[in-house]
Amino acid sequence: MHEMSLMGGVFEAIEATLAHHHVKKVLLVKLKIGQLTNAEPDALQMAFAAFAQGTVCEGAELQIEMLPVKGRCRSCSEEFMVPGLIFACPVCQHLGIDITQGEELLLESLEVEE
């Protein structure tokens, strides 16, 4: 369950963000997570609850937005959604693509009570 290690990184980012603020409680944590991380939202929710115990995040809501995989063709520069993880350009069928979305793990925002 790699979601625990992913959530460990999220909590490091939360701690760094809150380090210079006087926050009583975190009310909401919003994450954006790419499909290629293979993170399961339910497992992330459980990991969040475990990490939040005894912290200002205890009782906070976790909202997760899963981001689909997008790519850009290195040959014709077409930008496209990557359906079913088929990494080929739908226009020219070139196999060389750059992933432009889908690998992220982003702390989008925090809603806090000061």
From Swiss-Prot:
Residues at which Ni(2+) binds: 2
Gene Ontology biological-process entries: protein maturation; protein modification process
Keyword terms of this UniProt record: Metal-binding, Nickel, Zinc
Binding site for Zn(2+): 73, 76, 89, 92
Top-rank lineage group of the source organism: Bacteria
HAMAP family given in the database record: HypA_HybF
Family to which the UniProt record says this protein belongs: Belongs to the HypA/HybF family.
Protein name: Hydrogenase maturation factor HypA
Species: Desulfitobacterium hafniense (strain Y51)
